[in-house]
Amino acid sequence: MEQPKGWTWQDRAEGSIRRGTALDPSLEPVDGILAFPTAYLPQRLLITRSEEDQEAYDQELRTLRDAADTFGWQLEIESDTGRARELTPGVPGFLRAYLTTPDEPIRRESPVAPDAWRVLQRARRMSRSTMPRTSLEHVLSIDPVGLNPFTRTNPFTRTNPFTRTNPIRGAGAGGSDDYLAPGRGARQPVSWLGPAPQRGPAPKRGRRPVVAVLDTGCGMHSWLPDDIVTRHVELDGVPVGLTDDADPERYPDLYGQLDGEIDAVSGHGTFIAGIVRQVAPDADILSVRVAGALGVIDESSLLLAVAQVVELLRRHREDPSTGFPIDVLNLSLGYSHETPTDGLFSLTLYALLAKARALGCVVVCSAGNDAIDRPSFPASLWAWPGADNGIRADHDAPHVSVGALNPSAHSVALFSNVGPWVQTYAPGAAVVSTSPAFVGGEQAATRADLDGLRRETLDPDDYRGGFAVWSGTSFAAPYVAGRIAAELGTVPIEGVSADAAAKAVAAVAKTLPAPRDRG
C-alpha cells in the first residue's frame, strides 16, 4: 500500500501513542467549580492575551507559575508568535504554556508528570478566581461513528483504538455499536447508479455560494474536481490548515499494524464534500485539512485554522478582491468541556465562530456520536433554551447544531447526541457519498474464477468504485450545510447579510423532519 515518501516505522508507530489524557474531576477540587471528564493535553495550557488587559494577563501568569512550583513543575510560555496577537480584529490571541519538570529535582525528589488540570485548579484556589484567561488544551475528534473514545469510562485501554474500520462482525451488537457492523451503517463500498450532480452555468451577476469544510481534506474524485473544490488556500503567504505529506485522503493506511486496514477517518473529508456536492451541486467547496488519519486535533491547532478561515472571510467582506468568500462553515468535529456552564470555558472558539456569523456566515456543527445529551463543543455554543453557558442570543447569521436521523427519517439514530442544544436532525445513518479509490488489505471471503472471469464475493474495503456507505453526525451536518448553501443560491460577490442567512436557515429547517416519540 502506498505510503508518503520517507514514511518510517516511527511515523507508523505514532498511531499507538495516545493523544491526551482523561481528566479526573476528583483531583484538586475547587468550591463552586463542578467539573466533568474530558480529554486534554496534560503538559499544556492556553492563555488568552490582549493588549487591553496586559496587567491582568501578567498577574494570571504569575499565579500559574506559583501554582506549578508547588508541584515541583516549571511553566514556560512559548516564544511570541502570531497567535499572541489578535487572531482576527476583535478576537484576542493566545499563547501556549508548557509544563515541564526541572533538570535537577528541586526538593530532592522526582516530581510526577505535569498535569495542567491540577495546576489550573490550584491557581484558581490560590487566586480565589476562575482564572478566566486560562484553559486546558483539549483534544477534539472527528465525528464518524466509532471514533469518539473520550467520553467512555476507560477511553485509552486499547493500544490502537483508531485502526479498526469495522470491528463488529455477524449479528447486531446491540446499542449504538450496532451501527459499526457492515450492512448496519458501518463504512463499506456501495454502487452509485444515478447521474452525477448537475452543475448549472456560472451566474452572470453575483457568485456561487461557498461551503468551507474543516476536516481531513478532500481526495480526488470525478465529482470533486479542482474547479469545484479549492484544496489549498493561503493567508499572507502562510498555508491554511495542514499541508504535510501524511494526507489521509490519499494514503489510507498510515498508522497501526502493517495489515492494510484503512485508518478510521481516511476519506472522511471526501465523504463530507460529496454530501455537499449532492445537495448543493451549484456550490463551491473550500476544503481545509485540520486533522490527520487518527482523527484527533489539538485545540490550539483548530483555533489557528478557524482564525485563518475567519480572517479570509473578513478580508473578502471588506474587499472582494482579497481574502476568500465563505457563506457556510461546516465543522464535523467536537469535544466535551470539563466546565461548560456559566462561561467557565475557553471563549476563543466561540468568539471566532461569532465573528464569522457577524460577517454573514452560517456555522453548522455536528452534535457528536456518544448517544448522550451532554453539550458538545462547538455544537452547543449558542443560546439554546435553558442554557447556562452565558451566551446571549444575537441577530447574526445562525449557529446550527445537527444530530443524525436513521434512513427512515422517522427516528433519531441511536448513536446521535441529543438535547435542547441540538437544533435539528438530518440524514446521518447509512448515508451514501464519495470516497477516494482506496483498496484496503481485507479480501473477498470467497473467490472462484471461471472462463477468464474473476468471480468473488464483495471485497469489504475496495473503494475503487468511488462510493461508500457511512454513518455519523459528521455526515448530517454537511447535509444541512449544503441545503443552506443551495437555499442561498446566487449570492452577492461580497457575501450575504445576516438576515438573508437566517431566512435561508429557516427555510431549510422547515423541510427537515422533526422526529418525536409517537408511542
What feature does the model see in each segment?
Residues V211-V213, L286-V288, D327-S332, V362-C365, ...:
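Structural recognition of the beta-strand scaffold that forms the well-ordered cores
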Residues T130-P132, R208-V210, P281-D284, F324-V328, ...:
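Loop/turn elements at helix/coil->beta-strand transitions in domains of secreted/extracellular proteins
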Residues A291-R392, D461-P478, P513:
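Substrate-binding/access-modulating region of protease and related hydrolase catalytic domains
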Residues P155-P167, G175-A283, L304, Q308-P325, ...:
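Active-site core segment of subtilase-fold serine proteases
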Residues Q3-K5, P25-L41, L45-E55, Q59-Q188, ...:
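Autoinhibitory propeptides
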Residues V139, G217-G219, S332-S336, V362, ...:
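Catalytic metal-binding/acid-base residues of hydrolase active sites
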Residues R317-G334, P398-V400, G489-G519:
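C-terminal subdomain of the subtilisin-like protease fold in secreted/lumenal serine endopeptidases
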Residues L235-V240, D244-D245, L381-G489:
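Extracellular S/T/G-rich loop segment that most often corresponds to the catalytic His/Ser-adjacent loop
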